[in-house]
Design a protein with these regions (language model features):
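Loop-helix junctions at membrane interfaces
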Residues: 1-156
Length: 156
């Protein structure tokens, strides 16, 4: 794929991801998260790891700036890292020969890796390091645990 086309596809996927986050914000984490992960998977498989990483890392920051993402800036880099891990694992496992086994393995590994990264970074590190109100820490503990695995599995 030519560089101009890759850049265009990356920009369109980033815009699509932002619009989907805005449009599904009121529908809850399972719908929004699944949509986000779906766009990330498409980005990884269509434009490759570079474009996928761009969408994965830039989108949480743009969502925060537009007030459609998390309200706490401290979790935004963790989300970017989780998204990046999902993209990289999918790309590494699926960019070569395609098979059903490889696809299932790629989805499960990518979803599991994203869940693990977000759980460790947000729940185990940020919630302990930051002085968060108890209610917000509990909310992060719920949001960034098993629902991340479910939305990653659904979306990818």
């Amino acid at each position: 794929m030519k560089a101009t086309r890759k850049i265009t596809y990356t920009a369109v996927l980033l815009a699509l991801l932002i619009v989907l986050q805005w449009a599904t914000k009121s529908l809850g984490q399972f719908v929004t998260g699944s949509c986000v992960n779906c766009v990330l998977a498409v980005a990884a498989l269509v434009v490759g790891w570079q474009g996928g990483l761009t969408v994965a890392v830039v989108s949480p920051f743009v969502a925060f700036l537009l007030s459609i993402g998390p309200k706490n800036i401290a979790v935004v880099p963790a989300i970017a890292v989780g998204n990046a891990v999902l993209v990289l694992v999918l790309w590494l496992l699926l960019n070569r020969r395609f098979s059903v086994l490889r696809a299932v393995l790629g989805v499960v590994c990518a979803a599991g890796a994203k869940f693990l990264i977000l759980y460790l970074l947000v729940v185990q590190v940020l919630c302990r390091v930051l002085t968060l109100p108890e209610k917000q820490a509990a909310m992060f503990g719920t949001m960034f645990s098993w629902p991340q695995l479910v939305t990653a599995l659904i979306g990818t």
